[in-house]
From Swiss-Prot:
The chain crosses the membrane at residues 8-28, 45-72. Belongs to the ATPase C chain family. This is ATP synthase subunit 9, mitochondrial. It is found in: Mitochondrion membrane. It is a multi-pass membrane protein. The lineage of its organism: Eukaryota, Viridiplantae, Streptophyta, Embryophyta, Tracheophyta. This protein is one of the chains of the nonenzymatic membrane component (F0) of mitochondrial ATPase. SUPFAM superfamilies: F1F0 ATP synthase subunit C.
Amino acid sequence: MLEGAKSIGAGAATIASAGAAIGIGNVFSSLIHSVARNPSLAKQLFGYAILGFALSELIALFALMMAFLILFAFRFFSKKGKLAGAPV
């Protein structure tokens, strides 16, 4: 029962990866439109696009970290909140 709940929780945590992918697509779409309008600002706009990409990707990495924590880190705790297998 607990394993199923952890799998559902990890799956829900990875939904943020889809949002990050949409955000990255929006960042580079805006970059292409902006460079097409004003090619002389291409270098400056590319720097802003890389910053936007990094921040969007950070959300996906945090979601992946949370999914791994849900799946693997919480298995070491018993029902009483103490480490499983630790001396009492």
